Amino acid sequence: MSTQLRAAEISDIIESRIEKFGIKAEERTEGTILNIKDGIVRVYGLRDVMFGEMVEFPENTYGLAFNLERDSVGAVVMGPYEHLEEGMTARCTGRILEVPVGEALLGRVVDGLGKPIDGKGPIDTSETSPIEKVAPGVITRKSVDTSLPTGLKSIDAMVPIGRGQRELIIGDRQTGKTAIAIDTIINQKHTGVKCIYVAIGQKQSSVAAVVRKLEEHGAMEHTIVVNASASEAAALQYLAPYAGCTMGEYFRDRGQDALIVYDDLTKQAWAYRQISLLLRRPPGREAYPGDIFYLHSRLLERAAHVNEAYVKEFTKGKVTGKTGSLTALPIIETQAGDVSAFIPTNVISITDGQIYLDVNLFNAGIRPAINAGLSVSRVGGAAQTKIIKKLIGGLRIALAQYRELEAFSQFASDLDEATRKQLEHGQRVMEILKQPQYQPLSVGEMAIIWYVVNNNYLDQVELKKVVDFERSLLSFLRDQHQDLLDEINKNPNYSEKIIEKIKAVVEEFVKTQSY
């Protein structure tokens, strides 16, 4: 005999089935592609889209909403767009662009969206972070007070860089801008500073050469390389610096120190100009859009030295008593030494100083070709290593006087003894400032070299033998007095006791060694 269900039971069964029925309703605004040209997609609809929101196209392709007009949206496609056609559907995602962050990225080469391109497999990280963030406020910042040694004598002596500073490297093409940045990254091997190198609009071969050099010198272990090469879409060249900055902020916000190199921001400005003109935004000076200053200011303001309270709040109390820093070394390429052009003046006004590389010095064999007269560090002086600060004394003034005398001596036939000595001393200082690439020096080595310069030991050395003298001195120190170098590196403060030790070692070298 079959059992019949009562009406109440039927209604209970239906109710329980409805409750168990799992369906997620997802509301998305859709639009239709009107046209595609040069990586710019115009979409009809998408009434709820936000500026900078990711827009989804068919075949897992994404774009960024840039122009919000009355009936349509102008979006820039991130990557290939040949498969997109008019009439296809575009959807809002409700998300802004995020990139992977974390320790797992160290030692890897990624593209402008954080995807690995070095053939070493996927990156083992689940953490992501938005590429656009608000820079830390004034209250959460700390003044720059800790040195970031570059290992280059001329920079650490005359234009010192501190952790959390923004120091511009500016000069014509082929004057050694990238070389300074790479040497600085190599020098962070034993400092614990994590490095991010962002290559924008460069040849693939140039980036490969940089990666190879970093690997040769054991610097790739603490470095992330972000590459948006010249062959990639303008959108990726525009986004790469922000992606690299987000990766650096991961370390800064957790009480660590990071260094980021943007090589170079001129190419990013070109990419943004291209996007803006294709979106038919009104052009301004040099055809750049009106918000080109904001492009770089919002990026470089994110480099900062943040205080303990900021780190503690960000990590929810997991990290206490530590400050974090992100130091930026943006690079700008000038045309025929014109530092008064639009982009160079913009970035000079945003940064905390600049290192100006002179093509004439470079061609004269003075490398790194730093023009001490035009280079300045506005906040790094407070962070300079104490012993170096004391030993260099009036180096800048001495060099300025030497250049003045050098110009004068070309017209004067006979010079008095004092002028001749000053000229000869200046020539020796210029020789000492020369430094081969990929050979950064420690604080201890630099301190002893500046002691030698300051106390006129070089005046007894022939001009053509100054480089040999320095090479022999460094070799002597590393072989026989490594303990003194270690002592200075560990505690780089000036004291009479340490100066006595340096004097004894230098006297021993001068008496016993040949060069």
UniProtKB/Swiss-Prot annotation:
It is an enzyme of class 7 (translocase). Its EC number is 7.1.2.2. The record marks 375 as: Required for activity. It is a peripheral membrane protein. GO terms for cellular component: plasma membrane; proton-transporting ATP synthase complex. The keyword Nucleotidyltransferase does not apply. ATP binds at residues 171-178. GO terms for molecular function: ADP binding; ATP binding; proton-transporting ATP synthase activity, rotational mechanism. GO terms for biological process: proton motive force-driven ATP synthesis. Produces ATP from ADP in the presence of a proton gradient across the membrane. The alpha chain is a regulatory subunit. This is ATP synthase subunit alpha. It comes from Coxiella burnetii (strain RSA 493 / Nine Mile phase I). The gene is atpA.
